[in-house]
């Protein structure tokens, strides 16, 4: 199976299945001398891990990460950083009834046709369990980017039909939804409680923002920064759409509205989401991602078995009724991996570039 590595200079390779003994990652290209300890990684892993509220899967995984290499006396050495998280709460028997069935809207059918063999336990390699390693690797990238003045944060901006206006970052870490509006939390909780009673699932929208990014990151033509961000975010399980800045709303905008006019005091708007011509402008980089409802629900769904016979599928086991609830740290991680990769690429070619034009902020 190819396609397990992301990045060019800062690279992340992951391996492991949902019900295998462990998940692993190799992170290569991290600059030496970065102070790094387990807590730097564990902090974000704890934000993503399952079983932290009644609104997520009740699978109990500590997601305790081990650093196997690349860190000595509390600092990165420049060597590959090996990471490991052991799986401890697998219940594979929950999936024995569907081992020869294809869950509708899941990767079962496509994996079967592509490889001719698949690990049906918890979705195997296609499970979102894999994203734990992305979060661990992304935490390394976030730590280095923070040393360069770049801060990456995310929040839930919609759950099902409920739009969530941004009010304050202070609220995001105080609830299970990463919700930036504390007044919306009771409505979200009530909606999720009813969803469980309905034995159904729902989608969500996540917004992720990078502040402090300098102008110049991005490699036209084919490695535009927004193209690579879209690639990274679309690679997250259940993501079916990505927008940068105004995204699809720009269709209804006129040029006089959409263009981000500049004054000596700064940009007057940020419809471009901080990226112009595939290169960062120095404004906040803003991306939105849409996650579909999970297909692993207990309401029967029509499908087929491996022989093509009609079948009704009921997925037992422990699943997230809304995968978007735990997606914010994953989106942050993928944005961080992209930005650090492009920061290192920019240094390699353009470290000596200097212009007299001031760097504009946001008015």
From Swiss-Prot:
GO terms for biological process: amino acid biosynthetic process; aromatic amino acid family biosynthetic process; chorismate biosynthetic process. Keywords: Amino-acid biosynthesis, Aromatic amino acid biosynthesis, FAD, Flavoprotein, FMN, Lyase, NADP. Disulfide bonds: none annotated. FMN binds at residues 125-127, 237-238, 277, 292-296, 318. NADP(+) binds at residues 48, 54. Its cofactor is FMNH2. It catalyses: 5-O-(1-carboxyvinyl)-3-phosphoshikimate = chorismate + phosphate. CDD domains: Chorismate_synthase. Reduced FMN (FMNH(2)). The keyword Lyase applies. GO terms for cellular component: cytosol. One of its GO terms (molecular function) is FMN binding. The keyword Amino-acid biosynthesis applies. Homotetramer. Belongs to the chorismate synthase family. This is Chorismate synthase. It comes from Pseudomonas syringae pv. syringae (strain B728a).
């Amino acid at each position: 199976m190819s396609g397990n590595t992301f990045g060019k200079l800062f690279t992340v390779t992951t391996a492991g299945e949902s019900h295998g003994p462990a998940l692993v990652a190799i992170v290569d290209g991290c600059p030496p001398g970065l102070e790094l300890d387990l807590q730097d990684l564990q902090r974000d892993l704890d934000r993503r891990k399952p079983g932290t509220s009644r609104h997520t899967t009740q699978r109990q995984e500590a997601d305790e990460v081990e650093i196997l290499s690349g860190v000595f006396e509390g600092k990165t050495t420049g060597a590959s950083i090996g990471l490991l998280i052991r799986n401890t709460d697998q219940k594979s028997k929950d999936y024995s009834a569907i081992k020869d069935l294809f869950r509708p809207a899941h990767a079962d059918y496509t994996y079967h046709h592509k490889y001719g063999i698949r690990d049906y336990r918890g979705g195997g390699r296609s499970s979102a369990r894999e994203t734990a390693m992305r979060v661990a690797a992304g935490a390394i990238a976030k730590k280095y980017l923070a040393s360069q003045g770049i801060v990456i944060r995310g929040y839930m901006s919609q759950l099902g039909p409920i739009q969530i206006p941004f009010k304050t970052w202070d609220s995001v870490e105080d609830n299970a939804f990463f919700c930036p509006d504390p007044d919306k939390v009771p409505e979200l909780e009530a909606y999720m409680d009813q969803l469980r009673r309905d034995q159904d699932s729902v989608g969500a929208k996540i917004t992720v923002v990078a502040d402090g990014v300098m102008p110049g990151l991005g490699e036209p033509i084919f490695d535009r920064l927004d193209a690579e961000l879209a690639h990274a975010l679309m690679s997250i399980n259940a993501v079916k759409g990505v927008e940068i800045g105004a995204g699809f709303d720009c269709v209804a905008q006129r040029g006089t509205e959409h263009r981000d006019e500049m004054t000596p005091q700064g940009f007057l708007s940020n419809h471009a989401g901080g990226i112009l011509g595939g290169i960062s402008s120095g404004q906040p980089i803003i991306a939105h991602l849409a996650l579909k409802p999970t297909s692993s629900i207990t309401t029967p769904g029509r499908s087929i078995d491996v022989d093509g016979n009609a079948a009704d599928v009921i997925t037992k086991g422990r699943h997230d009724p809304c995968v978007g609830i735990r997606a914010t740290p994953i989106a942050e991680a993928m944005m961080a991996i992209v930005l650090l990769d492009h920061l290192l690429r920019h240094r390699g070619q353009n470290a000596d570039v200097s212009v007299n034009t001031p760097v504009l902020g946001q008015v």
